[in-house]
Protein backbone atom coordinates (compact mmCIF):
# COMPACT_ATOMS: atom_id res chain seq x y z
CA UNK A 1 0.00 0.00 0.00
CA UNK A 2 1.32 3.42 -1.02
CA UNK A 3 1.77 5.65 2.00
CA UNK A 4 -0.43 8.70 2.49
CA UNK A 5 0.85 12.22 1.90
CA UNK A 6 -0.94 14.31 4.53
CA UNK A 7 0.63 17.54 3.34
CA UNK A 8 -0.56 17.12 -0.26
CA UNK A 9 -3.90 15.73 0.91
CA UNK A 10 -5.50 12.62 2.39
CA UNK A 11 -8.81 11.48 3.86
CA UNK A 12 -8.85 9.69 7.22
CA UNK A 13 -11.69 8.13 9.21
CA UNK A 14 -11.53 8.39 13.01
CA UNK A 15 -13.80 7.13 15.79
CA UNK A 16 -14.72 10.19 17.87
CA UNK A 17 -14.65 9.40 21.59
CA UNK A 18 -17.42 10.27 24.04
CA UNK A 19 -17.31 13.87 25.43
CA UNK A 20 -14.83 15.04 22.78
CA UNK A 21 -15.91 17.91 20.55
CA UNK A 22 -15.35 17.57 16.81
CA UNK A 23 -12.85 20.43 17.03
CA UNK A 24 -10.91 18.64 19.79
CA UNK A 25 -10.56 15.54 17.61
CA UNK A 26 -9.34 17.58 14.63
CA UNK A 27 -6.88 19.41 16.87
CA UNK A 28 -5.59 16.14 18.37
CA UNK A 29 -4.97 14.63 14.94
CA UNK A 30 -3.32 17.82 13.66
CA UNK A 31 -0.96 18.00 16.65
CA UNK A 32 0.01 14.32 16.38
CA UNK A 33 0.50 14.59 12.61
CA UNK A 34 2.61 17.75 12.84
CA UNK A 35 4.79 16.14 15.49
CA UNK A 36 5.28 13.00 13.38
CA UNK A 37 5.94 14.95 10.17
CA UNK A 38 8.20 17.49 11.87
CA UNK A 39 6.20 20.46 10.59
CA UNK A 40 4.59 23.41 12.35
CA UNK A 41 1.23 23.48 10.62
CA UNK A 42 -1.09 21.22 8.65
CA UNK A 43 -4.41 22.04 7.04
CA UNK A 44 -7.09 19.73 8.50
CA UNK A 45 -10.89 19.87 8.24
CA UNK A 46 -13.75 17.54 9.14
CA UNK A 47 -16.98 16.43 7.49
CA UNK A 48 -20.10 16.41 9.66
CA UNK A 49 -20.02 17.65 13.23
CA UNK A 50 -20.84 15.26 16.07
CA UNK A 51 -22.12 16.45 19.45
CA UNK A 52 -19.77 15.81 22.40
CA UNK A 53 -22.18 13.16 23.75
CA UNK A 54 -22.07 11.25 20.44
CA UNK A 55 -19.38 8.86 19.23
CA UNK A 56 -18.44 7.30 15.94
CA UNK A 57 -17.36 8.04 12.39
CA UNK A 58 -15.64 11.37 11.86
CA UNK A 59 -14.06 11.99 8.45
CA UNK A 60 -11.00 14.24 8.34
CA UNK A 61 -9.46 15.76 5.24
CA UNK A 62 -5.93 17.16 5.08
CA UNK A 63 -4.24 19.42 2.53
CA UNK A 64 -6.14 19.61 -0.74
CA UNK A 65 -8.60 17.00 0.50
CA UNK A 66 -10.18 19.70 2.69
CA UNK A 67 -11.82 20.82 -0.57
CA UNK A 68 -13.73 17.51 -0.54
CA UNK A 69 -15.41 18.29 2.80
CA UNK A 70 -18.72 19.35 1.23
CA UNK A 71 -18.75 16.23 -0.95
CA UNK A 72 -18.05 13.98 2.05
CA UNK A 73 -20.66 15.72 4.20
CA UNK A 74 -23.31 15.12 1.55
CA UNK A 75 -23.00 11.34 1.94
CA UNK A 76 -25.72 9.34 3.66
CA UNK A 77 -25.17 8.81 7.38
CA UNK A 78 -26.09 5.87 9.59
CA UNK A 79 -26.66 6.09 13.34
CA UNK A 80 -27.47 3.78 16.22
CA UNK A 81 -29.52 5.77 18.73
CA UNK A 82 -30.79 4.96 22.22
CA UNK A 83 -33.92 6.88 23.18
CA UNK A 84 -35.45 7.22 26.65
CA UNK A 85 -39.22 7.51 26.37
CA UNK A 86 -41.41 9.09 29.05
CA UNK A 87 -39.38 12.24 29.66
CA UNK A 88 -37.93 15.22 27.84
CA UNK A 89 -34.92 17.48 28.34
CA UNK A 90 -34.29 21.02 27.01
CA UNK A 91 -31.41 19.79 24.81
CA UNK A 92 -33.20 16.58 23.73
CA UNK A 93 -30.28 14.55 25.11
CA UNK A 94 -28.55 13.95 28.46
CA UNK A 95 -26.65 17.23 28.50
CA UNK A 96 -29.49 18.73 30.57
CA UNK A 97 -31.77 17.35 33.27
CA UNK A 98 -35.33 16.12 32.50
CA UNK A 99 -37.90 18.92 32.50
CA UNK A 100 -41.12 16.93 31.92
CA UNK A 101 -42.37 13.39 32.52
CA UNK A 102 -44.99 11.29 30.71
CA UNK A 103 -46.51 7.80 31.00
CA UNK A 104 -45.13 4.95 28.88
CA UNK A 105 -47.44 2.09 29.88
CA UNK A 106 -49.46 2.47 26.69
CA UNK A 107 -46.44 2.04 24.40
CA UNK A 108 -46.17 -1.41 22.83
CA UNK A 109 -43.45 -2.68 20.51
CA UNK A 110 -45.99 -2.64 17.69
CA UNK A 111 -46.83 1.00 18.46
CA UNK A 112 -43.14 1.96 18.25
CA UNK A 113 -42.65 0.14 14.95
CA UNK A 114 -45.76 1.80 13.51
CA UNK A 115 -44.63 5.25 14.68
CA UNK A 116 -41.20 4.78 13.13
CA UNK A 117 -42.75 4.07 9.72
CA UNK A 118 -44.13 7.60 9.75
CA UNK A 119 -40.63 9.06 9.61
CA UNK A 120 -39.44 7.20 6.50
CA UNK A 121 -39.12 9.39 3.41
CA UNK A 122 -39.03 13.17 3.09
CA UNK A 123 -39.86 14.87 6.38
CA UNK A 124 -39.90 18.34 7.90
CA UNK A 125 -37.80 18.63 11.06
CA UNK A 126 -37.45 21.59 13.43
CA UNK A 127 -33.85 21.68 14.72
CA UNK A 128 -33.19 21.73 18.48
CA UNK A 129 -33.01 25.15 20.14
CA UNK A 130 -29.64 24.04 21.50
CA UNK A 131 -27.98 23.73 18.08
CA UNK A 132 -25.54 25.57 15.84
CA UNK A 133 -28.31 26.78 13.53
CA UNK A 134 -28.04 30.54 13.02
CA UNK A 135 -30.81 32.94 14.02
CA UNK A 136 -30.23 36.48 12.73
CA UNK A 137 -26.51 35.79 12.59
CA UNK A 138 -26.26 34.23 16.06
CA UNK A 139 -26.01 30.57 17.04
CA UNK A 140 -29.28 29.19 18.40
CA UNK A 141 -27.54 27.58 21.38
CA UNK A 142 -26.23 31.00 22.50
CA UNK A 143 -29.77 32.40 22.52
CA UNK A 144 -31.19 29.28 24.21
CA UNK A 145 -28.62 29.42 27.01
CA UNK A 146 -29.58 33.03 27.68
CA UNK A 147 -33.27 32.11 27.86
CA UNK A 148 -34.21 34.09 24.74
CA UNK A 149 -37.42 33.26 22.87
CA UNK A 150 -37.01 32.46 19.18
CA UNK A 151 -38.37 30.15 16.51
CA UNK A 152 -36.45 27.87 14.19
CA UNK A 153 -37.72 27.03 10.73
CA UNK A 154 -38.31 23.40 9.82
CA UNK A 155 -35.83 21.83 7.42
CA UNK A 156 -36.63 19.32 4.71
CA UNK A 157 -34.71 16.07 5.26
CA UNK A 158 -34.78 12.49 4.06
CA UNK A 159 -34.90 9.41 6.27
CA UNK A 160 -34.00 6.44 4.05
CA UNK A 161 -34.25 3.74 6.70
CA UNK A 162 -35.35 3.53 10.31
CA UNK A 163 -35.38 0.26 12.22
CA UNK A 164 -36.23 -0.74 15.79
CA UNK A 165 -33.28 -2.72 17.15
CA UNK A 166 -34.33 -3.07 20.78
CA UNK A 167 -37.46 -2.47 22.85
CA UNK A 168 -37.07 -2.42 26.64
CA UNK A 169 -39.27 0.36 28.01
CA UNK A 170 -38.59 3.05 28.84
CA UNK A 171 -35.61 2.58 26.47
CA UNK A 172 -35.68 1.83 22.76
CA UNK A 173 -32.79 1.54 20.31
CA UNK A 174 -33.09 2.42 16.63
CA UNK A 175 -30.93 2.41 13.51
CA UNK A 176 -31.32 5.40 11.20
CA UNK A 177 -29.99 6.09 7.70
CA UNK A 178 -30.54 9.72 6.79
CA UNK A 179 -29.48 12.76 4.80
CA UNK A 180 -27.11 15.53 5.78
CA UNK A 181 -28.42 17.93 8.42
CA UNK A 182 -30.62 15.46 10.30
CA UNK A 183 -30.65 16.01 14.05
CA UNK A 184 -31.09 12.64 15.73
CA UNK A 185 -31.84 14.52 18.98
CA UNK A 186 -34.80 16.15 17.25
CA UNK A 187 -35.84 12.79 15.83
CA UNK A 188 -35.89 11.39 19.38
CA UNK A 189 -38.14 14.29 20.40
CA UNK A 190 -40.48 13.69 17.48
CA UNK A 191 -40.67 9.93 18.06
CA UNK A 192 -41.62 10.61 21.68
CA UNK A 193 -44.32 13.02 20.53
CA UNK A 194 -45.65 10.51 17.98
CA UNK A 195 -46.01 7.98 20.81
CA UNK A 196 -47.88 10.50 23.02
CA UNK A 197 -44.94 10.40 25.38
CA UNK A 198 -41.82 12.54 25.50
CA UNK A 199 -38.45 11.21 24.44
CA UNK A 200 -34.81 12.19 24.51
CA UNK A 201 -31.51 10.76 23.31
CA UNK A 202 -29.39 8.79 25.80
CA UNK A 203 -26.71 7.48 23.44
CA UNK A 204 -25.73 8.11 19.83
CA UNK A 205 -23.14 6.39 17.66
CA UNK A 206 -22.54 7.29 14.02
CA UNK A 207 -21.68 4.08 12.21
CA UNK A 208 -21.36 5.30 8.63
CA UNK A 209 -20.69 8.44 6.59
CA UNK A 210 -20.96 7.77 2.86
CA UNK A 211 -18.67 4.82 2.12
CA UNK A 212 -16.78 5.11 5.43
CA UNK A 213 -17.94 2.69 8.12
CA UNK A 214 -17.09 2.47 11.81
CA UNK A 215 -15.02 -0.64 11.06
CA UNK A 216 -12.74 1.56 8.89
CA UNK A 217 -12.08 4.09 11.66
CA UNK A 218 -8.98 4.51 13.78
CA UNK A 219 -9.31 5.20 17.50
CA UNK A 220 -7.64 8.21 19.08
CA UNK A 221 -5.19 5.97 20.93
CA UNK A 222 -4.16 4.44 17.58
CA UNK A 223 -3.34 7.70 15.79
CA UNK A 224 0.40 7.47 16.39
CA UNK A 225 0.54 3.86 15.18
CA UNK A 226 -1.53 4.84 12.11
CA UNK A 227 0.88 7.65 11.28
CA UNK A 228 3.94 5.43 11.59
CA UNK A 229 2.47 2.67 9.43
CA UNK A 230 0.54 4.50 6.75
CA UNK A 231 1.84 8.08 6.45
CA UNK A 232 4.89 9.10 4.43
CA UNK A 233 7.43 11.43 5.99
CA UNK A 234 7.85 14.66 4.04
CA UNK A 235 10.62 15.30 1.55
CA UNK A 236 12.04 18.76 0.95
CA UNK A 237 9.60 19.18 -1.96
CA UNK A 238 6.50 18.28 0.05
CA UNK A 239 7.51 20.56 2.92
CA UNK A 240 7.57 23.54 0.58
CA UNK A 241 4.23 22.59 -0.99
CA UNK A 242 2.25 22.62 2.28
CA UNK A 243 -1.10 24.21 1.28
Residue positions per predicted region:
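Catalytic/RNA-binding core of pseudouridine synthases
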Residues: 1-243
Amino acid sequence: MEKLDLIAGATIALDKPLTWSSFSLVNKFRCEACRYLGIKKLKVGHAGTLDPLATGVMILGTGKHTKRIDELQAGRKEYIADIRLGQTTPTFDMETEPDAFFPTEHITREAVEEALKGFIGTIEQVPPAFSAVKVDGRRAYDLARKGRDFELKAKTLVIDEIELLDYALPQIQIRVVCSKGTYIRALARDIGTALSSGGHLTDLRRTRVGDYRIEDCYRVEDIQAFLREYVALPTEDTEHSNP
